[in-house]
Regions:
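N-terminal amphipathic/basic-hydrophobic helices that include classical n-h-c signal peptides
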Residues: 1-10
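Conserved RNA-binding domains used in RNP assembly and mRNA/RNA metabolism
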Residues: 11-102
Length: 102
């Protein structure tokens, strides 16, 4: 569109992937988080200093986020308020959350 020879650009609102369950909207995220790494073997000091931490990626719907926890699900019943593939993360382990666009 133009107005007096000037092009007008309308900014399009982003649309995000989501699920609607019992009239509530749940958004889909890519969540990056840190997980512990365990090893029951013996280690010297140098090996202890090099212990890695696991950097994990989860893709899921966010059920609830509080100051302490992030609760997610990946599957749900289309006819009832039933969730599967659930996780609860301590919020301190979460590095980032990116809402997925359509």
């Amino acid at each position: 569109d133009t107005f007096c020879g000037i092009y007008l650009y309308m900014r399009r609102k982003k649309r995000y992937k989501h699920a609607i369950i019992n009239k509530k909207k749940y958004y889909f995220y890519t969540i990056k988080w840190l997980d512990i790494t365990g090893d029951a073997g013996h280690k010297n000091k140098d090996e202890m200093e090099k212990l890695p931490i696991c950097k994990m990626i989860t893709q899921a719907y966010v059920y609830k986020k509080t100051k302490k926890y992030l609760t997610t699900f990946s599957s749900y019943d289309q006819d009832d308020e039933v969730f599967s593939d659930t996780n609860i993360f301590p919020i301190g382990c979460v590095i980032s959350m990116e809402k997925i666009t359509l």
